[in-house]
Amino acid sequence: MTDLGVAVVVEDDADVRNLVEAVLSQAGFEVHSAADGREGVDVIRRLQADVVTLDVGLPDIDGFEVLRRVRQFSDAYVVMLTARTDELDTLTALHTGADDFMTKPFRPRELRARVAAMMRRPRQDRISETPPVAGAAAPATRAPQDSVLRHNGLELNPDSRTVTVDGASAGLTRSEFDLLHALLKGAGAVRSKADLVRVVRGEYYRADAYIGESDERAVEVHIGNLRRKLRENPLQPRWLQTVRGVGYRLAPERD
């Protein structure tokens, strides 16, 4: 197995499948593939995939249904690919649990960059499952006191990428964690949706890159999912306050 782990390409178009396989193999993954949805679910489960690229328009079950089934047993990073440009596809993918969404034709370098950005931000359980190195000191169970961000009963540890609400763990996706971290660091400053798109896209996303309505809608979906996981009432927010027509900011401190 390669250093980066296992990637599975679920794609019925042989040309696209071969291209994605080459991109991920060159990036350092052990790459496997499937030509339909049911086979894809089986391969992802059997190989315990770390990264999945998933076509929406598969011949048996569509990519959204594949993703629903995969999310029952795996937290693999998932990038959905589609030839359709309907904004509803993007929103459905993010609601279902995709980490990213790209339309065909796509630039191979951009796909590789997006996957690399995801891998630089490991999920909480991927950190906890990392095997210890023989002879190494045990990792700290807590970040330095001044690196933990706290607000209204919520604690975010940027080193372990963990979040707790009133002492209970909140399992967030990479994008949800990054958005929450950005708003907490902003200490009440308004962050525009365009700014938050760049937070989600990661380091490779150029500051002058075009940001469309679908990108901003994707941020809205992530914020909605984040509120649901934090069990926040948007009408009486503890953490995420909407600034109508602009974006979001951290809600005021409560007594």
Give the location of each predicted region:
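N-terminal/domain-start alpha-helical segments
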Residues: 1-127, 131-137
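Glycine-rich nucleotide-binding loop
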Residues: 39, 245-247
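CheY-like receiver
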Residues: 122-160
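A structural micro-motif at secondary-structure boundaries
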Residues: 144-178, 190, 249-255
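Positively charged, aromatic-enriched patches within helix-turn-helix-type DNA-binding elements
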Residues: 162, 167-174, 178-238, 243-244
